[in-house]
């Protein structure tokens, strides 16, 4: 069964010119890029995307970071796309939890600047895709 997930290449990934490497890894995993867009993120979109973190101490810095420079937003499709991309991304903390061979393990430096976002469930994927790609 084909599944869809939202993938974001965050500002640090775009600024460090890792977009091609990350997309290549997604495709080599056997996943397909169904939609791809470079965009500047508004504070409104960022607030909606990260709504579950509102009120947490890091919320303001998270919004500041994600709106600081362009991101690449993509709809990624394939069998078990959500779990497959999360495995490819690696643990959220790129130093302590992401293993070598993952995007974060190979390129990440800090927890906040961890290069990519991938939906964590089918429900999140549906909500996030609707936010980032309303006509999809």
From Swiss-Prot:
Biological process annotations from GO: CTP biosynthetic process; GTP biosynthetic process; UTP biosynthetic process
Record's GO cellular component terms: cytoplasm
InterPro entries: NDK-like_dom, NDK-like_dom_sf, Nucleoside_diP_kinase
Reaction it catalyzes: a 2'-deoxyribonucleoside 5'-diphosphate + ATP = a 2'-deoxyribonucleoside 5'-triphosphate + ADP; a ribonucleoside 5'-diphosphate + ATP = a ribonucleoside 5'-triphosphate + ADP
Enzyme Commission (EC) number: 2.7.4.6
Active site per UniProt: 117
Predominant location category: cytoplasm
Pfam families: NDK
Keywords carried by this UniProt record: ATP-binding, Cytoplasm, Kinase, Magnesium, Metal-binding, Nucleotide metabolism, Nucleotide-binding, Phosphoprotein, Transferase
Function (record text): Major role in the synthesis of nucleoside triphosphates other than ATP. The ATP gamma phosphate is transferred to the NDP beta phosphate via a ping-pong mechanism, using a phosphorylated active-site intermediate.
Assembly, per entry: Homotetramer.
The name this protein goes by in its record: Nucleoside diphosphate kinase
